[in-house]
Structures are given as structure tokens and as C-alpha cells.
Amino acid sequence: MPQLDTSTWFITILATILTLFIIMQLKISTYYYHSNPEPKTTKMTKSLIPWEIKWTKIYSPLSLPLR
């Protein structure tokens, strides 16, 4: 049974890891990061909904008068 030639495995694995490292560095370097992150100020808008304008009272069945 012939033996497997493993003499080129080291350089193949090393080249693969180096290539993956370079590709990942190039991908990460394309992202834009803010140098000073600040919270975004959002303006709260109050929407006028009909049931918020008028006062309504909700009666629970237990508080209704007996008939």
C-alpha cells in the first residue's frame, strides 16, 4: 500500500491560513466606524388619537349597579 505524501501539507495549510487572514482583514477594513459615537436625538411626535382626546370611563362588570 503506497504511503500518502504529506511533504506539501505544511505549505498548503500555511498559505490557506495566510490567505484567509488577508481576505478577512480586507473585508473588515472596508467598514466605516464612527470615531466618536453619540446617541441619536429623536423628536417625539404626539399623535392625536380620538380615544386619547376625550376622557372615557371603563366600567367593570362588578362595579355596575345591580338590576
UniProtKB/Swiss-Prot annotation:
This is ATP synthase protein 8. GO terms for molecular function: proton transmembrane transporter activity. GO terms for cellular component: mitochondrial membrane; proton-transporting ATP synthase complex. The gene is MT-ATP8. The lineage of its organism: Eukaryota, Metazoa, Chordata, Craniata, Vertebrata. GO terms for biological process: proton motive force-driven ATP synthesis. The chain crosses the membrane at residues 8-24. The modification N6-acetyllysine is found at K54, K57. It is found in: Mitochondrion membrane. Belongs to the ATPase protein 8 family. The modification N6-succinyllysine is found at K54. Mitochondrial membrane ATP synthase (F(1)F(0) ATP synthase or Complex V) produces ATP from ADP in the presence of a proton gradient across the membrane which is generated by electron transport complexes of the respiratory chain. F-type ATPases consist of two structural domains, F(1) - containing the extramembraneous catalytic core and F(0) - containing the membrane proton channel, linked together by a central stalk and a peripheral stalk. During catalysis, ATP synthesis in the catalytic domain of F(1) is coupled via a rotary mechanism of the central stalk subunits to proton translocation. InterPro entries: ATP8_mammal, ATP8_metazoa. It is a single-pass membrane protein. Signal peptide: none annotated. It comes from the Eukaryota. It comes from Artibeus jamaicensis.
